[in-house]
């Protein structure tokens, strides 16, 4: 959500992950709640978002959240494995400097899923 402060704060973390792991198969996909295409385009430019962003109505996004474990926090992060199942999820911002263990857990799960040694 473009109005979400913690969402904005975690963009550099996801940009870093996208840069480090995209060529190995990771695809970061942001999903924004209640924004239109123009708002999202301006947001991604202003905040230098280096990964694709989707947008949708709160109703559509709530359905997605329900389908992916019933988590309704903004932000929420999900690591979806190659088989389409959720292998890791976290309700809240993932900020390396604030919570290094959560960031390390995510990196570990990414590397495990991508089979990186």
Region locations from a protein language model:
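Conserved redox-active cysteine motifs that mediate thiol-disulfide chemistry
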Residues: 1-16
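Conserved segment of the thioredoxin-like fold in thiol-based oxidoreductases
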Residues: 16-60
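Short strand-loop junctions, especially beta-strand C-caps/beta-turns
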Residues: 2, 31, 92-93
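Extracytoplasmic/periplasmic, Sec-exported soluble proteins
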Residues: 6-9, 32-35, 72, 98, ...
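Thiol/disulfide oxidoreductase modules built on the thioredoxin-like
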Residues: 46-49, 56-109
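Non-globular targeting/processing and membrane-anchoring segments
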Residues: 110-117
């Amino acid at each position: 959500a473009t109005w979400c402060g913690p969402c904005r704060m975690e963009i550099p973390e996801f940009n870093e992950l996208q840069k480090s792991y995209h060529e190995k198969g990771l695809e970061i996909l942001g999903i924004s709640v209640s924004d239109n295409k123009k708002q999202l385009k301006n947001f991604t430019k202003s905040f230098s978002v280096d990964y694709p962003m989707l947008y949708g109505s709160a109703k559509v996004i709530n359905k997605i959240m329900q389908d992916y474990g019933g988590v309704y926090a903004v932000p929420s992060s999900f690591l979806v494995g190659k088989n389409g199942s959720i292998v890791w999820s976290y309700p809240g911002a993932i900020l390396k400097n604030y919570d290094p263990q959560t960031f390390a857990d995510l990196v570990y799960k990414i590397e495990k899923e991508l089979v990186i040694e």
